[in-house]
Amino acid sequence: MSINLNQIKQDLTQITNDVLTAANLRRGDIFVLGCSTSEVVGGHIGKASSREVGATIIETLLEILKPLDIQLAVQGCEHINRSLVMERSVAEAHDFEIVSVVPAMHAGGACSVAAFEQYSDPVEVEHTVAHAGLDIGDTAIGMHVKFVQVPVRPSLDTLGAAHVTALRSRPKYVGGPRATYDI
């Protein structure tokens, strides 16, 4: 499959803006990305990673999220236990467990590699509690999005050849028959 990087950027911008609108994030919130560039280019997850596509995806997300002061955490593959790349300042501010690994194309994936290259002081963390996230290629980001997770359906459900889903979170409803939830 031939990939048009400009189209990837355009579609990803639309998808991300849809998720941001639904998630109603605030400054400092964490947005997690799970992405298989193999799936984006029409391959099987983990079998056709694209450094070019990974770099384009991370660059595009940072262009959108940085001005909003929303922090991007990029999930790696199972070969690095789905650890995430984030800026050291974010990891330290949230007291996330920093782990010793540097992502590679086939141990972390192209987006993790791109994030590690594009961040100013990248680290890998074992786990995060994001407020929303984007899953490109069915990579399973749910373990990194805080409860209660709510599916978001962006206006586009594919990026390249990859299936796209998203999550936002909301506070848990607690109480009994007398409780109200609207303020």
Swiss-Prot record:
Q: Transmembrane segments in this chain: where?
A: none
Output the InterPro entries linked to this UniProt entry.
Antibiotic_NAT-like, DUF436
Q: Which SUPFAM superfamilies match?
A: TTHA0583/YokD-like
Q: Which family does it belong to?
A: Belongs to the UPF0340 family.
Q: Which HAMAP family match?
A: UPF0340
- Name this protein carries in UniProt: UPF0340 protein LCA_1354
Protein's organism: Latilactobacillus sakei subsp. sakei (strain 23K)
